[in-house]
Curated annotation (Swiss-Prot):
GO terms for molecular function: structural constituent of ribosome. Belongs to the bacterial ribosomal protein bL27 family. Transmembrane segments: none annotated. One of its GO terms (biological process) is translation. The N-terminus is cleaved by ribosomal processing cysteine protease Prp. HAMAP family: Ribosomal_bL27 (MF_00539). Residues 1-9 form a propeptide. The keyword Mitochondrion does not apply. One of its GO terms (cellular component) is cytosolic large ribosomal subunit. Keywords: Ribonucleoprotein, Ribosomal protein. This is Large ribosomal subunit protein bL27. It comes from the Bacteria. It holds the Pfam family Ribosomal_L27.
Amino acid sequence: MLKMNLQLFAHKKGVGSSKNGRDSEAKRLGVKCADGQFVLAGNILVRQRGTKIHPGANVGKGGDDTLFAKIDGVVKYERLGRDKKKASVYPVNVEEVIAE
């Protein structure tokens, strides 16, 4: 008599998990308003971590170091000493902005 030894295996291979494969969402940091751009009071100028750019005239700093305009005007980025920068907002007539 003929004996058969039949052995069945799984047709899906077991796969181990990886410890990689995760990342945090981008925080969308950076300059939001360009030099010479007209802004309204409350507009965000720069989103940053730490004070890479310091607040200048008519610019406030939020709790997360975000710089924002305190008045309507034109944005100006300036040097503050040798290695620092500051953002300022200077008032301007609305007619001058519309003419441009």
